[in-house]
Amino acid sequence: MGVTVDLEVVTPEKLILSETVQLVTVPGSEGYFGVLSGHVPMISSLRSGVVRMGQGDDAVHLAVSKGFAEVRPDRVTLLVDRAVFGKKVDAAAVTKIRDAAQDELDGTPTESEEYETLRDKLDFANAQLAALEGELV
């Protein structure tokens, strides 16, 4: 067994990332979890958050929307609706989107489908800003 895992991040449009990493931290729906080589196989739902590849100053951060993760001992596959590298985030544009979503959300009934759509937009905007700063949300 090696000391690395193959990581793939896939959206409906394209393969965003295919890398070999030593450690990946993933935003599971029940909280963040780390994956090293030899991890027990599992499937998890994902929430919007930040995928961190590596550790310390060399870490790469990727904002992802909700989706699913398949973990195997030597491979992690993330299927998400959207993904953006932290270094490519336009902070001003994302902040504007976040603020608009928050304003709309404040007047929307929590049981509505519109509320869920706005909540997803807000969560992904927050994930993008966190990825830009190299933080987990």
Curated annotation (Swiss-Prot):
Alphabetical list of InterPro entries matching this protein: ATP_synth_F1_dsu/esu, ATP_synth_F1_dsu/esu_N, ATPsynth_dsu/esu_N
Protein name from the UniProt record: ATP synthase epsilon chain
Domain of life: Bacteria
Function, in words: Produces ATP from ADP in the presence of a proton gradient across the membrane.
Cysteine disulfide links: none
Primary residence: membrane
Keywords for the protein's UniProt record, in alphabetical order: ATP synthesis, Cell inner membrane, Cell membrane, CF(1), Hydrogen ion transport, Ion transport, Membrane, Transport
GO terms of molecular function: ATP binding; proton-transporting ATP synthase activity, rotational mechanism
Complex and partners: F-type ATPases have 2 components, CF(1) - the catalytic core - and CF(0) - the membrane proton channel. CF(1) has five subunits: alpha(3), beta(3), gamma(1), delta(1), epsilon(1). CF(0) has three main subunits: a, b and c.
Cellular compartment(s): Cell inner membrane
Gene Ontology cellular component terms for the protein in this record: plasma membrane; proton-transporting ATP synthase complex
